């Protein structure tokens, strides 16, 4: 199986456990690894025979911007479900980063990775 990697998808969203996160929002970043059979697209040179990665970016950004989940696990699941829902993918890995997580004395970020198949 082939893979399509889309990295560095950023959007401002309102998912978070604390009220301030859902009110003020924060930046999220997503990396996708999409398992897809690219043989037909490689032969046909037709965008309809693959997953348009611009569409994948738009799906992720829309979910980040419009969702107000408490848990990043829920947001990652929604992203995986939407990518698998295109019908063109067999499996997807979603690496969802909460940039600047609100943790005292912590200046890093937190990344959650999930792997889902249909």
Swiss-Prot record:
Enzyme Commission number(s) from the entry: 4.1.2.25
One Pfam entry name: FolB
One annotated GO biological process: folic acid biosynthetic process
Gene Ontology terms, MF aspect: dihydroneopterin aldolase activity
Alphabetical list of InterPro entries matching this protein: Dihydroneopterin_aldolase, FolB_dom, GTP-CH-I_C/QueF
Binding of substrate, residues: 21, 53, 72-73
Active site positions: 98
Catalytic activity: 7,8-dihydroneopterin = 6-hydroxymethyl-7,8-dihydropterin + glycolaldehyde
Keyword Lyase in record: yes
GO annotation, cellular component aspect: cytoplasm
Gene3D superfamilies documented for this protein: 3.30.1130.10
Function: Catalyzes the conversion of 7,8-dihydroneopterin to 6-hydroxymethyl-7,8-dihydropterin.
NCBIfam families in UniProt: folB, folB_dom
Name of the molecule in the record: Probable dihydroneopterin aldolase
Originating organism: Synechocystis sp. (strain ATCC 27184 / PCC 6803 / Kazusa)
Lineage, uppermost ranks: Bacteria, Bacillati, Cyanobacteriota, Cyanophyceae, Synechococcales
């Amino acid at each position: 199986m082939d893979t399509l990697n889309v990295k560095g998808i950023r959007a401002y969203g309102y998912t978070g456990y604390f009220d301030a996160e859902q009110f003020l929002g924060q930046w999220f970043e997503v990396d996708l690894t999409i398992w897809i059979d690219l043989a037909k697209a490689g032969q046909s040179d037709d965008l309809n025979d693959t997953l348009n990665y611009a569409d994948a970016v738009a799906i992720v950004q829309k979910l980040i911007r419009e969702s107000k989940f408490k848990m990043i696990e829920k947001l990652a699941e929604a992203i995986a479900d939407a990518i698998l829902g295109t019908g063109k993918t067999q499996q997807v890995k979603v690496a969802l980063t909460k940039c600047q997580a609100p943790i005292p004395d912590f200046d890093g970020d937190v990344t959650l990775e999930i792997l889902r198949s249909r």
